[in-house]
Structures are given as structure tokens and as C-alpha cells.
Amino acid sequence: MIKDENWGIPLVRIRDFFSAQPDVTADGEDFYFGHCRITLTPITGHFLGPWEMPRTQIRMEGPEEDVRIIHRRFYLRFLSAGG
């Protein structure tokens, strides 16, 4: 299963979130939850009028169960405006 999403959250906040998860491991620039690989990519050049909005592409790829669990955890953490 693949989840490929674009979030209006700075890369550093997302990295901090995954780094704080006891069952998530880091491997270089990627994170792993079970057999789910999590790749974070900063997106530059997105403007909302005169303001630049931080954007991060998040790609979760792996077995359906692993992807659903970690995606739900991430989604619930950052669901509210401003996370």
C-alpha cells in the first residue's frame, strides 16, 4: 500500500514526530515503521499570496497494516490546524 501526501507542515516538525515514536527507526533520510518505509521530501516555492507556506511530501510505502497504523497516528497528531 502507498500513501503519497502533501502536508503544510515544516519538514523539521515531521522529522521530530517520527523520531519521537518508540517503534519508528531512522535510516539516513528515511524512517521505518515495521516494514513501512516513510520518505519525507521538502517542497519549495509554494506561495499563498505574498506568504510562503512550508510544505512536505510524505510517502508511506509497505504492507497495508503497517501503513494504516502509522498513517493514522501521524494524521491524528497533525489533524488540527497548525498541528
Model regions and ranges:
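Short Lys/Arg-enriched alpha/beta "domain-start" segment
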Residues: 1-26
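Short, intrinsically disordered, mixed-charge
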Residues: 16-23, 72-83
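Short solvent-exposed loop/turn micro-motifs enriched in small/polar/acidic residues
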Residues: 23-25, 31, 53
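A short, structured beta-strand/loop element
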Residues: 32-52
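Broad gene-expression machinery/nucleic-acid interaction feature
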Residues: 28, 35, 55-57
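C-terminal structural segments of small proteins and small subunits
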Residues: 53-80
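Beta-strand elements of well-folded, non-transmembrane domains
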Residues: 6-9, 42-44, 62-66, 78
